[in-house]
């Protein structure tokens, strides 16, 4: 067994928010430092002066370059492009300085802005990219309704990315389905996200009449679809409640809740959770109404607590975790009535909830941090032994 202590650098935008990528990067960095004794650094571009949202080991160093790409989000398209190029130039310069200073064995990118130049930095480290999105969502426009020039620009940008991905020492996706979306790449493998380290696999009692949803308040998370489905559910099961937790702007969804005349005592929209695992033991069902989902970590978390799940069969994430009818339900995108029917099927059948919950517990055991962490260690060992 290879016991070499590698020096690892992660490049990711930020750690200050409660996003899935932030959580997974934090988990893996902690595990590599604490369990394998690796020298781990995380290089950020955003959130200067802001603490990590998730607990970070004292053994992990954080270097914030204070580039500020997030300042460009609300800028007009062409102004955004010009400012982006200036920030990108600065980012390349200071990241190159840090990589030569640290001299890591391995540099891991979450494939944001640094993918444009990471392979050109000749610091001697093996470059790995890990993608937390489907191919369709990678480098997509975030402007809502992009104009023709914006769509053309992002299409060109995605094509350019393929050349950069091909140069990586290894390109890691989270699911087999996501891996199949890149047939032109031969340097690709699949390693899923891990179940959070502090979640103990256990089973809830399935007695509460409570449904939960966890994720950002954003269009792609589909909470508008969920509220419309809940409108159907509430008519038949007024004694059940729905609690939604997430960061972001709740106002559009609060407005929709009012427009649909939903019972605000039974349908509640909350802010972000500092400790999400406290909610699962008091839930009998988790729903994931996302329009697109690269993985779906909350599905695994719910399963670890024996909570059955309902999700739209979107992207590559949910179908890699949910076996339809076994540990949850997959619903045809974006069938609101079908989503409501699957929720109600579980609400009215406690035995089915318990059976699916128990099956989910077994599924979650496949994703422990020990198992996933050792898959990463095996990859590191292979890359270093091969001198890639």
Segments (PLM) and residue ranges:
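A conserved mid-protein helix/loop that constitutes part of the nucleotide-sugar donor-binding site
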Residues: 19-27, 209, 213-232, 252, ...
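Short hydrophobic beta-strand element within catalytic cores of glycosyltransferases
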Residues: 308-312
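Aromatic "clamp/platform" in nucleotide-sugar-dependent glycosyltransferases that forms part
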Residues: 272, 291
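Membrane-proximal helix-turn-helix segments that form the acceptor-binding/catalytic region
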Residues: 93-101, 150-170
């Amino acid at each position: 067994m290879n016991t070499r202590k590698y020096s690892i650098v992660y490049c990711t935008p930020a750690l200050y928010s409660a996003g899935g990528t932030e959580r997974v990067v934090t988990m893996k960095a902690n595990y590599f430092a604490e369990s394998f004794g690796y020298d781990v650094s995380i290089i950020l571009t955003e959130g200067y002066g802001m603490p990590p949202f998730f607990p970070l080991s004292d053994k992990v160093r954080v270097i914030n370059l204070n580039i500020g790409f997030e300042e460009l989000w609300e800028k007009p398209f062409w102004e955004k492009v010009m400012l982006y190029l200036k920030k990108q130039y600065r980012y390349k310069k200071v990241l190159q300085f840090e990589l030569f200073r640290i001299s890591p064995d391995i540099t891991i990118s979450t494939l944001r802005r640094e993918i444009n130049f990471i392979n050109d930095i000749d610091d001697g480290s093996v470059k790995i990219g890990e993608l937390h999105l489907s191919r369709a969502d990678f480098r997509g426009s975030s402007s809502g309704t992009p104009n023709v020039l914006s769509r053309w620009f992002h299409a060109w940008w995605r094509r350019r990315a393929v050349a950069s991905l091909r140069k990586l020492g290894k390109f890691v996706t989270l699911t087999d389905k996501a891996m199949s979306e890149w047939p032109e790449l031969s340097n690709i493998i699949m390693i899923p996200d891990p179940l959070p380290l502090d979640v103990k696999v256990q089973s809830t009692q399935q007695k509460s009449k409570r449904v939960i949803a966890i994720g950002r308040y954003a269009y792609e998370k589909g909470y508008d679809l969920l509220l419309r489905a809940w409108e159907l559910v509430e008519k038949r099961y007024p004694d059940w409640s729905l609690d939604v937790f997430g960061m972001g702007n709740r106002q559009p969804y609060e407005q929709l809740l009012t427009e649909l005349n939903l019972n605000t005592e039974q349908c509640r929209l909350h802010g972000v959770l500092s400790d999400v695992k406290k909610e699962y033991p008091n839930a009998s069902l988790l729903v994931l109404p996302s329009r697109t989902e690269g993985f779906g970590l909350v599905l695994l978390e719910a399963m670890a607590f024996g909570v059955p799940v309902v999700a739209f069969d979107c992207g590559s994430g949910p179908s890699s975790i949910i076996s339809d009818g076994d540990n949850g339900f997959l619903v045809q995108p974006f069938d609101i009535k079908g989503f409501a029917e699957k929720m109600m099927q579980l609400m009215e059948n406690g035995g089915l909830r318990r059976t699916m919950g128990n099956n989910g517990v077994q599924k979650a055991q496949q994703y422990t941090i020990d198992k996933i962490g050792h898959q990463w260690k095996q990859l590191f060992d292979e890359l270093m032994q091969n001198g890639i």
